[in-house]
């Protein structure tokens, strides 16, 4: 973050938009922090500096962060990620603590890329290289210059950033990527290398140059030249078309040889710096980001490669705090919200945010869905509702006057909506609302919780409440589990019920994790109508090893269990084996589920259940009950004892 005055990208961290973003510079307005800053601050959102049509080139959110030395309301970076892949320009990435800024931009490939540059500067990326990387990603042609600026500011790889700038000018995206590489190299020479690459036109080549000292040479026209420095190799590869530079000097020979390498963005994987080159070539901004990170960055870059923009941000993070920003949204960087950085909102960006948003969307999507992962040090709200305004913590509350009072803000965009505090020509939906992740899935997480101004008291939180207590219907997930069980149970044809219908046997299922047990329980409910399941509960602690103090008899552990009541012991044995075989092959928490058979000598008198009246109004919510609890023909037996 050296002071670099307003910075170079299209946006000058003050919130102004310079009109990079389109006709109605939708938000700008000077120092007023709301806008520019979270942008500059790191949470850049891709939107140009503040508002900006989503697609606008916008200076990425990474512009120098108010270079007057004061970090405006230090908004914990929580960049929602460079939207890269989907969504507008995706510049924002910068978020990461330090360097993040740069990386993010790159990923976004933000229109101008310039943004990336700015971000880099600001970030100064802990890694330093990060800054450059960002620019590279976004660099795409125009942005290049910006990239340079950022790098300089970052001071990150020394001249590395500058190198990036050069790359941008020359070949656009690739060039930028190269720059990132330079950052990684950090060596002054590295920076130069990047510049050279740009000249060549093989932006990727530039990246190679970045490689450590060798960079100088490598960056130069020849991807191979990059060989000089390990990172250089990568860059060189890029130039060749083979981000492969993977092998340091090898770059030229190995990845370089294959144009494919670069495209893949795999190059990034190969060797940090290489990654950068590769990313650029591919267009996988992420790759670039990685390069900046140097070694660390690479990992991030990889994710980016997948998702694209987000990844870049991550790369920066690699270097330092940036990670969070990088994660940006999703699992990988891709921008989904996935679990990780890329996805989008997901579990935590590259290292940065580990949040728990529910990522709910399964799969990559885990990306955004997970909810805006709460960032470092941001505890999740304690109570489901209460927090009327946003489930954030005090520091992130917008200044009182400035909060538009209408539209709910989509969680996760926290207050970065509408810098002017009102509809300023933007759609009424905060920029991130759309990619919010699967709407169909209410689970957990602030998302359905309190909306900005409360949502009319319609509901408190998503989840299964709503269905009758203790009753869940089926859903694809549970159906799949049930299917697996049915197949395994098909092996044992034994009586599952008895005439007297006494619940004398049971299967005690425990361990694994709460979620894995819960899912298994729902699956069993679907697969075996003849059983009755208790809700999940917790086991007490057993003995403390050694002579010391023992736990109190009531002390609950976090290990859960549930009991399956059955009418025949023989079926209990069969079910136990089926469950064992079902969970064993599965990955971690699930395979640790333990099962044992129990027998209740006098039987357990489960309370009788009377089917709801069909015609009466009373049936209103109850008639669904037999979906999973009843109607299987053995009802009569329950009350018979």
Swiss-Prot record:
Biased composition range(s): Basic residues: 41-50
Annotated segments matching region GAr: 90-325
Domain of life: Viruses
Keywords: Activator, Covalent protein-DNA linkage, DNA-binding, Endonuclease, Host nucleus, Host-virus interaction, Hydrolase, Inhibition of host NF-kappa-B by virus, Nuclease, Phosphoprotein, Transcription, Transcription regulation, Viral latency, Viral latency initiation and maintenance
Cellular component terms per the entry's GO annotation: host cell nucleus
Biased composition (Basic and acidic residues): 358-381
Region Chromosome-tethering GR1, annotated ranges: 40-67
GO biological process: positive regulation of DNA-templated transcription; regulation of DNA replication; symbiont-mediated suppression of host NF-kappaB cascade; viral latency
Site feature location: Required for episome maintenance: 518
Transcription regulation recorded as keyword: yes
Major localization listed first in the record, in broad terms: host cell
Compartmental location: Host nucleus
EC number(s) given by UniProt: 3.1.21.-
Designated name of the protein: Epstein-Barr nuclear antigen 1
Species annotation: Epstein-Barr virus (strain AG876) (HHV-4)
Upper lineage: Viruses, Duplodnaviria, Heunggongvirae, Peploviricota, Herviviricetes
């Amino acid at each position: 973050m050296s002071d670099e005055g307003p910075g170079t990208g299209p946006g000058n961290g003050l919130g102004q938009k310079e009109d990079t973003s389109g006709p109605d510079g939708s938000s700008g307005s000077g120092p007023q922090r709301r806008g520019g800053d979270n942008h500059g601050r790191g949470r850049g959102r891709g939107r140009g500096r503040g508002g900006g049509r989503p697609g606008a080139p916008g200076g990425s959110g990474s512009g120098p962060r108010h270079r007057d030395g004061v970090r405006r309301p230090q908004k914990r970076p929580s960049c929602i990620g460079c939207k890269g892949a989907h969504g507008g320009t995706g510049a924002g990435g910068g978020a990461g603590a330090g360097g993040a800024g740069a990386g993010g931009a790159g990923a976004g490939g933000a229109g101008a890329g310039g943004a990336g540059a700015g971000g880099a500067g600001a970030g100064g990326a802990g890694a330093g290289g990060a800054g450059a990387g960002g620019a590279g990603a976004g660099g795409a042609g125009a942005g290049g210059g910006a990239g340079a600026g950022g790098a300089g500011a970052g001071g990150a790889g020394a001249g590395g950033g500058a190198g990036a700038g050069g790359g941008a000018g020359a070949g656009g995206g690739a060039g930028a990527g190269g720059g990132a590489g330079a950052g990684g190299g950090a060596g002054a020479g590295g920076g130069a290398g990047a510049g050279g690459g740009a000249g060549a036109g093989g932006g990727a080549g530039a990246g190679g140059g970045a490689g450590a000292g060798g960079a100088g040479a490598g960056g130069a026209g020849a991807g191979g030249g990059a060989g000089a420095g390990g990172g250089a190799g990568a860059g060189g590869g890029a130039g060749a078309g083979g981000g492969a530079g993977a092998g340091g000097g090898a770059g030229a020979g190995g990845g370089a040889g294959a144009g494919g390498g670069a495209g893949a963005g795999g190059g990034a994987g190969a060797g940090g710096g290489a990654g950068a080159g590769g990313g650029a070539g591919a267009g996988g901004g992420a790759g670039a980001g990685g390069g900046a990170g140097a070694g660390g960055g690479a990992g991030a870059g990889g994710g980016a490669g997948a998702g694209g923009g987000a990844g870049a941000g991550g790369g920066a993070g690699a270097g330092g705090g940036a990670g969070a920003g990088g994660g940006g949204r999703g699992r990988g960087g891709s921008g989904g919200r996935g679990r990780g950085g890329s996805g989008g909102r997901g579990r935590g960006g590259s290292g940065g945010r580990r949040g728990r948003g529910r990522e709910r969307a399964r799969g990559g999507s885990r990306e955004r869905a997970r909810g805006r992962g709460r960032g470092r040090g941001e505890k999740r709200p304690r109570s489901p509702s209460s927090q009327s305004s946003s489930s954030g913590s005090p520091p992130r509350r917008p200044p009182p006057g400035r909060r538009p009072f209408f539209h709910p803000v989509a969680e996760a965009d926290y207050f970065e909506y509408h810098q002017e505090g009102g509809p300023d020509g933007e759609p009424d939906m905060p920029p991130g609302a759309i990619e919010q992740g699967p709407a169909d899935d209410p689970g957990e997480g602030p998302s359905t919780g309190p909306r900005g101004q409360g949502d009319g008291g319609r509901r408190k939180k998503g989840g299964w409440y709503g269905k009758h207590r203790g009753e869940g219907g089926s859903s694809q997930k549970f159906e799949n589990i049930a299917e697996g069980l049915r197949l395994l149970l098909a092996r044992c044809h034994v009586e599952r019920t008895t005439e007297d219908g006494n619940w004398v046997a049971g299967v005690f299922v425990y361990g694994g994790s709460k979620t894995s047990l819960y899912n298994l329980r729902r699956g069993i409910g679907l697969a075996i109508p003849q059983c009755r399941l208790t809700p999940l509960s917790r086991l007490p602690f057993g003995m403390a090893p050694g002579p010391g103090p023992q736990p109190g008899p009531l002390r609950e552990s976090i290990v859960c269990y549930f009991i399956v009541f059955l009418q025949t012991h023989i079926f209990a044995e069969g079910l136990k084996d089926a469950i064992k075989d079902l969970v064993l092959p599965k990955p971690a928490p699930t395979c640790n589920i333990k099962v044992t058979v129990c027998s209740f000598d006098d039987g357990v008198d489960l309370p009788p259940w009377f089917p709801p009246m069909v015609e009466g109004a009373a049936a209103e919510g109850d008639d669904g009950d037999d979906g999973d609890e009843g109607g299987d023909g053995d009802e009569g037996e329950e009350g018979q004892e």
